[in-house]
From Swiss-Prot:
SMART domains: AAA, ClpB_D2-small. GO terms for biological process: protein unfolding; proteolysis involved in protein catabolic process. The gene is clpY. InterPro entries: AAA+_ATPase (IPR003593), ATP-dep_Clp_protease_ClpX (IPR050052), ATPase_AAA_core (IPR003959), Clp_ATPase_C (IPR019489), HslU (IPR004491), P-loop_NTPase (IPR027417). It comes from Bacillus pumilus (strain SAFR-032). This is ATP-dependent protease ATPase subunit ClpY. GO terms for molecular function: ATP binding; ATP hydrolysis activity; peptidase activity; proteasome-activating activity. Gene3D superfamilies: 1.10.8.60, P-loop containing nucleotide triphosphate hydrolases (3.40.50.300). A double ring-shaped homohexamer of ClpQ is capped on each side by a ring-shaped ClpY homohexamer. The assembly of the ClpQ/ClpY complex is dependent on binding of ATP. It is found in: Cytoplasm.
């Protein structure tokens, strides 16, 4: 597990830095994460019996369901993927099969483990890259092999000794030059010099075209079988020493890490720490009367069921068991209820959390409190144009009121409404910013009313503009 396991309270405090409210949901995922650490301390026999308690989040869009799961993955360093339930089709139909979510999870784990391994060999890789740079900056002369005549081979010749002496002195001089260049490289004096290196050509292969077509598994097997028969093309590129060092370091690091070991660790990490977030799960629930669409939706549920229950999925890195993967499902459940899911799938999500709708006070906090708060982002963006943007407390409250009012009158899209409203509010200022010198601009309630009042109060206009 992570080097320093966080307590549930610490996890909630970390989530509070980015997400406002929703304490019940934060507590549920914090306990689920802590239980993974607790399970890792059990003896092997009992460890296999303890399975994660999957979570079902119920709440309107834009209240923080996805963000909670994403932040949890970052806190724990666990492999995390987000999938939409609506993207999958049941077996036998065109579209993505549900097993692809497990393959995507393993790919994410591979990337995480590979990055960690590359950091471990970074120092050695940079040494090797610098050696290659020295040889690129001071290339050696190719040895000329002259054809000897038979008499010279029999009786020897003085020219050969002279040639050896010349070559020896050239090698000494070359070595001396390379040492000088290596010193200059270390001092950073040659960063803007250009060198020509060979790099692998990045072109989409025919196998990439199979992605998303439901044929990933077939494409994967074909690539494994034919990969060695089709070597990657290389092309020559002229780069600065600074850029070339990055490319060569990455290449050398790849040589130093053992991909078999990476695959083994990644599969273990995906199995034991993986988190799969299934969004829009309410869209595959039955919606009242039976129809052919409902039959198809139920088919997707039945395909998801064995993955959530615990099964073995074949990937190009080996077999992956999903018994201990944590599944977090989420949905608004406007048209359907959680009880509209098939009973077997309902039973696999024992922890249910209802997320609250956002109030005016929540909107005020979202605008100001998180580390990545929207107002901080807009201030930083306009500061690049030399404009210091300030918002009065009353103006912030007015923006929150407008967001809440529009959500109530039209579709409730939660905190995402703030993006639309702030864009409209600052549209003119953002457009004129490069051409004017204003110094400090303070947004007041009157300015908010002037820019948004008419639109917010007109239901027809707000549906189209906000």
């Amino acid at each position: 597990m992570e080097k320093k396991p966080f307590t549930p309270r610490e996890i909630v405090e970390k989530l509070d830095q980015y997400i406002i409210g929703q304490l019940d949901a934060k507590k549920a995922v914090a306990v689920a994460l802590r239980n993974r650490y607790r399970r890792s301390l059990l003896h092997d026999k009992l460890k296999d019996e303890v399975v994660p308690k999957n979570i079902l989040m119920i709440g309107p869009t834009g209240v923080g369901k996805t963000e909670i799961a994403r932040r949890i993955a970052k806190i724990s360093g666990a492999p995390f993927i987000k999938v939409e339930a609506t993207k999958f089709t049941e077996v036998g139909y065109v579209g993505r099969d549900v097993e692809s979510m497990v393959r995507d999870l393993v790919e994410t784990a591979i990337r995480i483990v590979k990055e960690d391994k590359m950091k471990d060999v970074q120092e050695e890789a940079e040494k090797q890259a610098n050696k290659r740079l020295v040889h690129l900056l001071v290339p050696g002369k190719k040895k000329s092999q002259s054809v000897k005549n038979p008499f010279e081979m029999l009786f020897g010749g003085s020219d050969e000794d002279d040639r050896d002496r010349d070559q020896s002195s050239e090698e000494v001089e070359l070595e001396s030059t390379r040492k000088r260049i290596a010193h200059q490289l270390a001092m950073g004096e040659l960063e803007d010099h250009y060198v020509t290196i060979e790099v692998e050509e990045q072109q989409p292969s025919m196998f990439d075209m199979l992605q998303g077509s439901g044929m990933e598994q077939m494409g994967m097997n074909m690539q494994d079988a034919l990969g060695n028969l089709m070597p990657k093309k290389k092309k020559r590129r002229k780069l600065t020493v600074r850029e070339a060092r990055k490319a060569l370091t990455a290449e050398e690091a790849s040589k130093l890490i053992d991909m078999d070991e990476v695959s083994q660790e990644a599969v273990y990490k995906a199995e034991q720490q993986g988190i799969i977030f299934i969004d829009e799960i309410d869209k595959i629930a039955k919606s009242g009367g039976a129809s052919s669409a409902d039959v198809s939706r139920e088919g997707v549920q039945r395909d998801i069921l064995p993955i959530v229950e615990g099964s073995t999925v074949m990937t190009k890195y080996g077999a992956v068991k999903t018994d201990h993967v944590l599944f977090v499902a989420a949905g608004a459940f406007h048209m359907a209820k959680p009880s509209d899911l098939i009973p077997e799938l309902q039973g696999r999500f024992p922890i249910r959390v209802e997320l609250d709708k956002l109030s005016i006070e929540d909107f005020v906090k979202i605008l100001t409190e998180p580390d990545n708060a929207l107002l901080k982002q807009y201030k930083a963006l306009l500061e690049t144009e030399g404009i210091s943007l300030e918002f009065s407390d009353d103006a912030i409250h007015k923006i929150a009121e407008v967001a809440y009012h529009v959500n109530q009158e039209t579709d409730n899209i939660g905190a995402r409404r703030l993006h639309t409203i702030l864009e409209k509010l600052l549209e003119e200022l953002s457009f004129e910013a490069p051409d004017i010198t204003l110094g400090t601009v303070t947004i007041t309630p009157q300015y908010v009313e002037e820019k948004l009042g008419k639109i917010a109060n007109n239901k027809d206009l707000s549906q189209f503009i906000l």
